[in-house]
Amino acid sequence: MADRVNASQGAAAAPTANGPGGVRNVVLVGPSGGGKTTLIEALLVAAKVLSRPGSVTEGTTVCDFDEAEIRQQRSVGLAVASLAYDGIKVNLVDTPGYADFVGELRAGLRAADCALFVIAANEGVDEPTKSLWQECSQVGMPRAVVITKLDHARANYREALTAAQDAFGDKVLPLYLPSGDGLIGLLSQALYEYADGKRTTRTPAESDTERIEEARGALIEGIIEESEDESLMERYLGGETIDESVLIQDLEKAVARGSFFPVIPVCSSTGVGTLELLEVATRGFPSPMEHPLPEVFTPQGVPHAELACDNDAPLLAEVVKTTSDPYVGRVSLVRVFSGTIRPDTTVHVSGHFSSFFGGGTSNTHPDHDEDERIGVLSFPLGKQQRPAAAVVAGDICAIGKLSRAETGDTLSDKAEPLVLKPWTMPEPLLPIAIAAHAKTDEDKLSVGLGRLAAEDPTLRIEQNQETHQVVLWCMGEAHAGVVLDTLANRYGVSVDTIELRVPLRETFAGNAKGHGRHIKQSGGHGQYGVCDIEVEPLPEGSGFEFLDKVVGGAVPRQFIPNVEKGVRAQMDKGVHAGYPVVDIRVTLLDGKAHSVDSSDFAFQMAGALALREAAAATKVILLEPIDEISVLVPDDFVGAVLGDLSSRRGRVLGTETAGHDRTVIKAEVPQVELTRYAIDLRSLAHGAASFTRSFARYEPMPESAAARVKAGAG
């Protein structure tokens, strides 16, 4: 990339701002393949940061610099590139469009104050993008729509515009119309043509008059409806021509309020529309001063008064992304909400995920409060870091080698520690069991997983104590693929995916007696232990009870604990299909001992054998874990989801309306039927549904399903 960075925009000349009023933080969102990363290339060229654009297919773009992104030719992580236009610093936040990487999208939304919804002219709007628009509406985030890929063979601007308006509402109106190698401004009624990176202005052709007038009328009415001047509509309807400057002023206010959403067509390959888009971003989108800060608390959880987005206010910043680079080490991407960050200063680092979310992520992100020294500050241009003397309120920067700060942590003045309420991260719901291909790589695997979990809050690492498996909880197959790819290429660990074992359990269906006999007397010191036990089932959750009813010293007192130890060891191994036995009472009734050959080990073996014989004398049932799930699904897919849940042995508990044509389905489903549900639900509802899950209880597995498990264990 270095050969494409203009000399005047090189490492020593990163765009800077004197205060939050000179910053715009813009996140690009939309479907995968919509052209977000390529659009950023075109904007960087338009702002003369780059001399020419890079290519996704060639792996040369600014924002897709990760090895996995280059190989897969799609974004998998958040990236930031900044430019200066008309005296304003614009931080462009690129996010992945694929649903598996929604954690990166969430971080991008947190870092930004406004959003560009990027829609390809040959594709339209998908369901997750519609849901995201509703989410942004609920928090009042200012938005604009960019229709890209105007030069695609199947491009249809009119259809894409209609799809955006159908999905996002009637306040989505174009400011420009595409025309040949340029755009027609609907307010200025001028044609802007692009050639050799330059924009020229001329009068549109007469053949465009009708469509200009139609679109211009709708635009003007839309702007006037959002005007704070209530007399403007009356004057307009009375035939008065409203001055263009008045319309522009009202337009900019409505965009900043998040009540009007301009549409800008852009052809990234030719640069058409890039300057118009930058004008909307710098003049219409609000500065960080106009965007409310996240909720602020003390480390003890006490609400704190809202801080001003001001350079001189107390420091309040947040780590929105953490990466590990093999050459420069750990890099933290930080959004400054108030105050100023300077190099060689000490800040307080607070992480309080579990305080806010009940421990949901505390296994990989434990609560912590500690001081840390700031080293080198820089402004990111994708992977390239450009030195920063200071970072003002509202800006985004990169900080190298923060050893204690993790994604989601708050940085504040050590004299007045504060905590920002973390943004809500989606729970990873796809379990993938893995093992190091070579046993010698197990330590490297542990290190690599620890570092990846610190970087990615949507990745959860589980060391399952019952199944003895390492389980990655991921957002989907693509997310899991990137994790495995990174382990192999960054940490040099070859990993095998193995069959996931659901932690089933076994219990006795009825009372049974067992005789355990472990006798070996072939000369020398032998082994001698005999015991008789009775096994009784207990209610769910009762655990294990051991009773001693031996009379007459048939089993010497010192060996009775060994019988229990042997029973417990066999319970851990299972007596039916290799799963732990739970909820039983074992009563030691009788036994025999030898004055010389009896030993601790002999009675342990006798206890284990007695339990196995008791199991053979009665019915042993498998218990399976049941989860309660809550599925949020568009109404159009409710029938399909209900049918699918039924096929998974699910019991529907009820449904309720969630608004925005969505329904919540609550059901209980066996865990064994949910191992791929994150993938299947996405396919079933075209990516528009989501679900949560929580453990409910264990209950007997149906005999047909249990028989398949037993056959597999055999």
Swiss-Prot record:
Cellular compartments per GO CC: peptidoglycan-based cell wall; plasma membrane
Region G1, annotated ranges: 30-37
Sequence segments annotated as region (G2): 73-77
Residues noted as binding GTP in the record, renumbered to the chain: 30-37, 94-98, 148-151
Biological processes per GO annotation: ribosome disassembly
NCBIfam families: PRK12740.1-1, PRK12740.1-5, small_GTP
Miscellaneous comment as given in the Swiss-Prot or TrEMBL entry: Was identified as a high-confidence drug target.
Protein's UniProt name: Elongation factor G-like protein
